[in-house]
């Protein structure tokens, strides 16, 4: 081939590549709109394709968009396997009381279970992250990125400890809080995730000498919740159990009402009592076969079955509006799910733990 002919051929090939590249180019505003509609796991794949797409998915306005899409995440352990499932919350009108069936599962996977880890969590999902323990060493988990990050022991002298996870809305950082649970203390250790010195724990004084309540299986081991940057958890001071600005929901033998006590003023310790319709008004199974796992951002109580066998149901109750919604999720705990994962068809799924207001996050640990 002559040099001139070879040069012309190369120019033609370059034009074709340029034309092909331009035909595949997507304007940033359209790409952003598409990404905002996708689950986080799909966004991660696309962000690796082009640098300008990666700049979209790492922008604060984009990552914050996941906060408006809370989902129900649940997980359980079977032998040495760790199963994780995320399902969306259905779109329901405020006063709608109907049954829903959904076949949409946002994410479902299994991974080897972290060795020697305490399976019970003591904090809800906090801006997409969940905290575990491995003996006296905390473990932070990002379910979206499927990553576990072990942390150093906060204090070598502590024989046992409790860890909580919080989020600072001003600094936009997650913070792990640890304190001894076998003795009262007026100190805690705090580690800021993503900081330059991420492996360093700092000591912070508390207002009271106390220790977190160990709880039991009935009250889910004294869970903690982070609200507007403040941690609320069950604790004991002088043998009295205290709780922050929170609410106690009664499940006593009150047949005609469901009592709730709300701490209105933290400093004055003023409590208000509210009485709602009993659970049996909505569904008789709620009294004995379902358990309360949390509350939505809209104030709905969330109930799930004590034992999941073939059908996975979630009940949402708004005690103020007096509405009831039953949601049935297909593809979860049914025959197909069990066969695919080798879980057997004749035994219930046990030890399921729930995170009712989980949001996805692309945060790297």
UniProtKB/Swiss-Prot annotation:
Residues 20-69 form the F-box domain. Pfam families: F-box (PF00646), FBA_3 (PF08268). InterPro entries: F-box-assoc_dom_typ3, F-box-assoc_interact_dom, F-box-like_dom_sf, F-box_dom. Residues 1-20 are annotated as: Disordered. NCBIfam families: F_box_assoc_1. This is F-box protein At1g48060.
């Amino acid at each position: 081939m002559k040099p001139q002919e070879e040069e012309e051929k190369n120019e033609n090939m370059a034009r074709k590549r340029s034309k092909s590249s331009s035909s595949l180019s997507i304007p940033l505003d359209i790409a952003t709109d598409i990404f905002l509609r996708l689950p986080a796991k799909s966004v991660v794949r696309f962000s690796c394709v082009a640098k300008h797409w990666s700049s979209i998915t790492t922008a604060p306005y984009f990552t914050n968009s996941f906060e408006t899409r809370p989902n129900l995440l649940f997980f359980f352990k079977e032998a040495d396997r760790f199963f994780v499932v995320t399902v969306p919350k259905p779109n329901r009108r405020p006063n709608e009381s109907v049954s829903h069936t959904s076949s949409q599962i946002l994410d479902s996977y299994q991974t080897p279970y972290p060795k020697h880890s305490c399976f019970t969590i003591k904090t809800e999902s906090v801006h997409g992250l969940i905290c575990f323990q491995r003996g006296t060493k905390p473990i932070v988990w990002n379910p979206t990125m499927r990553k576990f990050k072990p942390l150093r022991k906060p204090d070598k002298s502590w024989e046992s400890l409790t860890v909580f996870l919080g989020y600072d809305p001003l600094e936009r950082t997650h913070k792990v809080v640890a304190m001894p649970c076998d003795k009262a203390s007026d100190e805690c250790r705090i580690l800021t995730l993503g900081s330059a010195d991420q492996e360093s724990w700092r000591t912070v004084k508390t207002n009271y000498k106390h220790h977190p309540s160990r709880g039991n299986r009935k009250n889910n081991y004294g869970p903690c919740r982070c609200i507007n940057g403040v941690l609320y958890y069950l604790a004991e001071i002088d043998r009295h159990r205290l709780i922050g600005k929170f609410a106690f929901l009664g499940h006593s033998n009150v047949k005609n009402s469901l009592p709730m006590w709300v701490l209105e003023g933290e400093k004055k310790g003023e409590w208000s009592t509210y009485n709602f319709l009993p659970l049996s008004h909505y569904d008789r199974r709620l009294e004995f076969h379902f358990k309360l796992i949390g509350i939505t951002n809209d104030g709905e109580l969330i109930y799930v079955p004590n034992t999941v066998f073939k059908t996975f149901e979630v009940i949402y109750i708004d005690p103020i509006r007096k509405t009831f919604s039953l949601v049935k999720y297909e593809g979860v705990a049914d025959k197909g799910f069990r066969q695919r994962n080798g879980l057997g068809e004749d035994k219930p799924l046990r030890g399921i733990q729930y995170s009712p207001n989980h949001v996805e996050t692309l945060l790297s640990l």
